[in-house]
């Protein structure tokens, strides 16, 4: 459903729409219809997810704005004005755009080494600012692979976090695409980048 009318961030509607414009409009009827087909029962029944939904607003205010600002004032001895400016505006705004870049930049610019027939690309810049989430051609070619890339932790820190959670039992049943499958798909459908 990527890059179709059922995709809430459809890049075919332009860069602005896929980056941030989708937040300013009503959802396309195909997005709503596709969303109703998704089985969310495992998440709805998860006590941690329910806690997060129930307390989202207070957690966001505390963890996203209050704690970073207070830490900056009391540990770095920064003024309240600068701390609020940096933490509540600059950092937050940058993080929003880094997140949105996954649906815009990583669908428009980059290479398609795994499947040249899909729009999502491998984009180094997005991967750097979005903790490894810019390896979008791999992610859309092998959507069940929890790593969303073949690369090391340095370039994909999200995988490092998931693997750390697996060590303490918070993540389990991690699925990966086999090396043989990746090689076969790349050979048949990937963009020929190197000669």
Segments the model singles out, each with a brief description of its role:
Residues 1-4, 23, 102-116, 127-146:
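Histidine-centered catalytic micro-motifs
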Residues 1-100, 135, 145-195:
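Non-catalytic, topology-defining segments of multipass membrane proteins
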Residues 47-58, 108-121:
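Interhelical loop and helix-boundary elements at the membrane-water interface
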């Amino acid at each position: 459903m990527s890059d179709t009318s059922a995709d809430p961030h459809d890049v075919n509607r332009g860069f602005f729409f896929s980056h941030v414009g989708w937040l300013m409009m009503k959802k396309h009827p195909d997005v709503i219809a596709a969303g109703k087909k998704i089985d969310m029962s495992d998440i709805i029944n998860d006590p941690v997810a329910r806690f997060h939904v129930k307390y989202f607003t207070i957690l966001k205010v505390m963890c996203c704005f209050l704690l970073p600002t207070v830490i900056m004032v009391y540990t770095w001895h920064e003024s309240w004005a600068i701390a609020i400016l940096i933490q509540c505006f600059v950092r937050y705004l940058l993080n929003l755009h880094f997140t949105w870049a996954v649906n815009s930049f990583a669908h428009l610019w980059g290479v398609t080494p795994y499947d040249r027939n899909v729009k999502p690309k491998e984009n180094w810049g997005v991967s750097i600012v979005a903790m490894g989430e810019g390896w979008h051609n791999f992610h859309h070619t092998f959507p069940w692979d929890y790593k969303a890339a073949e690369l090391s932790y340095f370039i994909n820190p999200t995988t490092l976090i998931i693997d750390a959670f697996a060590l303490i039992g918070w993540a389990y049943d991690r699925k990966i695409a086999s090396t043989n499958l990746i090689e076969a798909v790349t050979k048949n459908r990937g963009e020929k980048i190197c000669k």
